[in-house]
Amino acid sequence: MYAKALQLELQERGIPFVAEQSVRVKYKGQFLGTHRLDLMVNEAVVVELKAVYDINNFHIAQMLSYLKASEKPVGLILNFSRGALDIKRVVR
């Protein structure tokens, strides 16, 4: 539900985004698989949506992997679990 609500808000504000975008993961030039990004906003920011107790190092490492695969410098982890929205900015 959080994803759909955020997509609606972005759409109403005219902010371009792609939901569930697949990005290729490569290692030494070889294709290994894909990551599926929750949102790519404005072709610049990777957004990952969570509903967890706390954002931890695993979530940050996951975002860094997404940033590397998508070749984007900035990502946001949005955690909806604790009543108030928790936002963590991650820079590659």
Regions from the language model: what does each represent?
Residues F17, L37-I55, Y66:
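Conserved catalytic cores of phosphodiester-cleaving nucleases, focusing on short active-site segments
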Residues A3:
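Nuclease catalytic cores
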Residues Q11-G29:
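A short acidic/basic microdomain associated with nuclease active sites
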Residues K50-R92:
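Nucleic-acid nuclease catalytic cores
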